[in-house]
């Protein structure tokens, strides 16, 4: 004898207050929502990626990324790593960079966004840790994130001997940094690296009254 089982049905009762709050929230102009998101910390913005496809697309858009403030009023955090990585503070994701092939011992890297090719690039400069600083040569290599070739590639540069002494700043696909140059590396200048053409050159010399850090 076969017994017939009754199928249980599950009834979901929506909370009227929750639906009302969501309807009110949807009435907020999207431009105002983007303005509000731009004032939030990066970690908070990342949480809103799952709200809807529209929000995720807007947050990942180039316009929102460019308009998002670089600075933060909170205390800076330190990332400790045994090798070079590119880190996304909003998601906590890190991408390890390939090893730089060189016999030189000092490496300085700069990171920037190339709006022409829509790619992120890393410029690595390597110099010797010994020798005559007045005649210091350097090598420059570039790594493109997302490229098929997962390695740095050497670029041709014919520039004045210099040694970086500051972090880089990327503005309109150009990375700028302060460097020591001149006799005994006692003068300061601003170097620039065009991420699109991959050309490194001298942007300007700083007044002699400005002394390099010891």
From Swiss-Prot:
InterPro entries: F-box-assoc_dom_typ3 (IPR013187), F-box-assoc_interact_dom (IPR017451), F-box-like_dom_sf (IPR036047), F-box_dom (IPR001810)
SMART domains per record: FBOX
Domain F-box: 22-68
Top-level lineage group: Eukaryota
PANTHER family per the UniProt record, alphabetical: BNAA05G37150D PROTEIN-RELATED (PTHR31111), F-BOX DOMAIN-CONTAINING PROTEIN (PTHR31111:SF67)
NCBIfam families the record matches: F_box_assoc_1
Name under which the protein is recorded: Putative F-box protein At5g15670
Biological source species: Arabidopsis thaliana
